[in-house]
Amino acid sequence: MAREFSLAKTRNIGIMAHVDAGKTTTTERILYYTGKIHKIGETHEGASQMDWMEQEQERGITITSAATTAQWDGHRVNIIDTPGHVDFTIEVQRSLRVLDGAVTVLDSQSGVEPQTETVWRQATEYGVPRIVFANKMDKIGADFLYSVQTLHDRLQANAHPIQLPIGSEDDFRGIIDLIKMKAEIYTNDLGTDILEEDIPDEYLEQAQEYREKLIEAVAETDEDLMMKYLEGEEITNEELVAGIRKATINVEFFPVLCGSAFKNKGVQLMLDAVIAYLPSPLDIPAIKGVNPDTDAEEERPASDEEPFAALAFKIMTDPFVGRLTFFRVYSGVLNSGSYVMNTSKGKRERIGRILQMHANSRQEIETVYAGDIAAAVGLKDTTTGDSLTDEKAKIILESIEVPEPVIQLMVEPKSKADQDKMGIALQKLAEEDPTFRVETNVETGETVIAGMGELHLDVLVDRMRREFKVEANVGAPQVSYRETFRASTQARGFFKRQSGGKGQFGDVWIEFTPNEEGKGFEFENAIVGGVVPREFIPAVEKGLIESMANGVLAGYPMVDVKAKLYDGSYHDVDSSETAFKIAASLALKEAAKTAQPAILEPMMLVTITAPEDNLGDVMGHVTARRGRVDGMEAHGTSQIVRAYVPLAEMFGYATVLRSATQGRGTFMMVFDHYEDVPKSVQEEIIKKNKGE
């Protein structure tokens, strides 16, 4: 079957926001107006189309980014719903990686909130064009112009309204289109009867002022428009729309719209804006990658004629069809039943069936084309971030960066029967979510799970119970500490054993130096003249990696260390890989005596919003928790405090803040960086770990 929609008429968009800004409801309405749903599901009734996992419906938050496809105005719009809660940032990152544009949803009462900043920053890193939808205009305290101001103040975004609201809160009844200079009046809350009228007299002056500001802002991004504007010539609506589109796609300008998804107002106009201002796959630069055979950089322009190249961005286990791999096609065409090359793993995979998803129903299709987003059944080895390409034209596309987990819990099955089931369940969950790690403590045999935050692990333990019917006891959350060296040193590792039969002999000299933060472990072989034979070099590296998994101070993984093997000796008969592995680990232990080993702890960026009267309490909380305040700003009668606080001190803070502010204070935290723990704390940690 031929393509239904041309590339120019395809939009791949994400909907991103702070938790509770009304993102899922907005997506719902889009699906409703584009004819994919017959009855609207409300998030607060727990029956939304996109939130299809049971826990999402209970908690009223979106956890997994469901990809769905819809049609509007002769275009295909593929939508990826992204979670707004910080514990699920990997979900946001991996969806941003495969999008061409996004709609940022704000709560008009609060404007830009902490998580909006996080997602906005990630979208800027990936160069994603955005339009902004100020939602919840019907809410008490909704203030459209205040929301626009927060985009400037908190995100330094060049954002300008292309619409103005008529009325707000209960009186929100229409929208002024600053391009057509017309008013859309809603006569009911179903969004079915819309009247296009002239702008009401009392709003005319404000509309003219903001249209002028809009034209000026767009003209600043385009020389031709600037010349016309300065010479006082009239800029036509077509030129204005083209100017906004170009500036938005270049990520130089962000159009701001308003509405209330819950009351069905403004959603159709927002869909029009998605088509008008967000890019098609043809409008963005061709994706780049590396040819695994030649190491040369290559690109894949969006075209059906090019060789097939796609990126797997999500794995899901579906109760009916098993393992689903969501992928974005960048170039070429793929038919079900064909073979592709997973260039990231170097494995050939067969595509069983191809499904196009709509929230949680699915339609089987034969072929996907460049620019499409679909899910494949039957891929065995593919994980998040892998490239899938034509076997004859291999390319590895840029992958998705995965943040390290910062919090861990011990889990143990309640019965022997649960033991095996738990292993399978954890493995499946880890396949779906790369920020979730499962480790078995070799000494104690305990299973430890690690993730991005308490909610993240709660949800996973909950899924284990529901989807895999595994009952487990969960320990208290623990911080994922790390260890490192703070000084350079040289150390010898010498291992010799003679006890009848074949002996063991390994001798190495290694120079250890601190590495840059986040660079991990780097090994360099500087052996000259074969004093350590080449076949034993990998054993030295392996020995170091294995001993660094349990650090020298308190057994935490070591990070950010460079090791240079520069001298050593060997024995013709007795040297072996095992002997050199042991020698390397002895060198590490020896180095620890002089390399100033340190324990690192995760520092969280904490944003606390509390009534002004409680500001003193909040500052006290931060200092008492070894934190440092980074900045403050007033927001109505509240104060917003940003601070860096060690994760170890944040457990149970929700209860403390709640009682100090009579339930009016809230806080959000997101991992920021690792930092040395103070000496006194370090000694406590070592004592606790040795005493166990």
Curated annotation (Swiss-Prot):
InterPro entries, per the entry: EFG_II, EFG_III, EFG_III/V, EFG_IV, EFG_V, EFG_V-like, EFTu-like_2, G_TR_CS
Domain tr-type G: 8-282
Protein's cellular compartments: Cytoplasm
GO biological process: ribosome disassembly
One term under GO cellular component: cytoplasm
Broad class of where this protein is predominantly found: cytoplasm
UniProt: GTP binding residues: 17-24, 81-85, 135-138
PROSITE patterns assigned to the protein according to its UniProt record, in alphabetical order: G_TR_1, G_TR_2
Keywords: Cytoplasm, Elongation factor, GTP-binding, Nucleotide-binding, Protein biosynthesis
Molecular function in Gene Ontology: GTP binding; GTPase activity; translation elongation factor activity
Record Pfam families: EFG_C, EFG_III, EFG_IV, GTP_EFTU, GTP_EFTU_D2
Family: Belongs to the TRAFAC class translation factor GTPase superfamily. Classic translation factor GTPase family. EF-G/EF-2 subfamily.
HAMAP family linked to this entry: EF_G_EF_2_B
Purpose: Catalyzes the GTP-dependent ribosomal translocation step during translation elongation. During this step, the ribosome changes from the pre-translocational (PRE) to the post-translocational (POST) state as the newly formed A-site-bound peptidyl-tRNA and P-site-bound deacylated tRNA move to the P and E sites, respectively. Catalyzes the coordinated movement of the two tRNA molecules, the mRNA and conformational changes in the ribosome.
Name recorded for this polypeptide: Elongation factor G
